[in-house]
Amino acid sequence: MSAFTPASEVLLRHSDDFEQSRILFAGDLQDDLPARFECAASRAHTQQFHHWQVLSRQMGDNVRFSLVAQASDVADCDTLIYYWPKNKPEAQFQLMNILSLMPSGVDVFVVGENRSGVRSAEPMLADYAPLNKVDSARRCGLYHGRLEKQPQFSLESWWAEYNIDGLTIKTLPGVFSRDGLDVGSQLLLSTLTPHTKGKVLDVGCGAGVLSAALASHSPKVRLTLCDVSAPAVEASRATLAANGLEGEVFASNVFSEVKGRFDMIISNPPFHDGMQTSLDAAQTLIRGAVRHLNSGGELRIVANAFLPYPKILDETFGFHEVIAQTGRFKVYRTVMTRQAKK
């Protein structure tokens, strides 16, 4: 997180304008500009645990990771700098939450890559903080307005749900496959056999659909679920509760907060971090699994067929097998043996 993103580079073109500002940074915080920006005071709020990990090393208690911001997170701030994510409902959720806590008259800046859909900020905030475009560079747009009217925000109104095989899946903006089961997870689910036993870790759990489906036909499994996303953690907890299932759910950057070993690790690992393509999480998952699997334990993941996971699996475990595939996706399976590189 040392190099600045294009969005941050656009902000830096205007750094002189912020020297006296007390800023809350929020949104898709892909670098450590909030910790390094020259201003009167800097706070940050993020829904992404891995972004909090980086920023908290430099900002301490002035950065907070949570599903929703609280009044204390915006205290004394006179400026919001919001980094637009690629997910429009996620942006709307976060902006309505934060702006409902800030007083009228605060400066509102929205910055993001054009391909992320940052232009949507103008109509989204038209009734609250009418925006004007103040810069365009690095294929990004920077918008500014002043808060004229606080939006109303109620967390309950943002919950959604869908049903699959008799299970209720609870979701929130920003959760992967919020509108229904994705094809990759569906393929992975098709490989999970009834009466699975032991400790199962679901990495990158999203809305908790993999764990809920597994537990519904394998009641003896002991579930642990983790994700970097605060909305995903809350959605997974709600999904388990809605279906009368039990499991431990917490935020973790892949294995960063995971303790102990498991009999199975399942995952539909992401290969994007915001707008950027990144295989870091999947590589960390595969290489780190050897430290969290019992002997004979199994790693089972689904991925786009074009991604180079077979090589990493073979380098780490010594072998892999494809147990299901379509034209776009493959389900990989490997087992913890003596030849695995611990």
From Swiss-Prot:
Q: What does this protein do?
A: Specifically methylates the guanine in position 1207 of 16S rRNA in the 30S particle.
Pfam families cross-referenced by the UniProt entry: MTS (PF05175), MTS_N (PF08468)
Catalytic activities: guanosine(1207) in 16S rRNA + S-adenosyl-L-methionine = N(2)-methylguanosine(1207) in 16S rRNA + S-adenosyl-L-homocysteine + H(+)
Q: Write out the GO MF terms.
A: 16S rRNA (guanine(1207)-N(2))-methyltransferase activity; nucleic acid binding; rRNA (guanine-N2-)-methyltransferase activity
| GO cellular component terms, semicolon-separated | cytoplasm
Lineage at the top is: Bacteria, Pseudomonadati, Pseudomonadota, Gammaproteobacteria, Enterobacterales
* Primary subcellular site in the record, as a coarse category: cytoplasm
What is stated as this protein's family in its record? Belongs to the methyltransferase superfamily. RsmC family.
- The organism is Salmonella typhimurium (strain LT2 / SGSC1412 / ATCC 700720)
Q: What is this protein called?
A: Ribosomal RNA small subunit methyltransferase C
E.C. number(s) listed in UniProt: 2.1.1.172
Cite the entry's keywords alphabetically: Cytoplasm, Methyltransferase, rRNA processing, S-adenosyl-L-methionine, Transferase
What HAMAP family does the entry give? 16SrRNA_methyltr_C
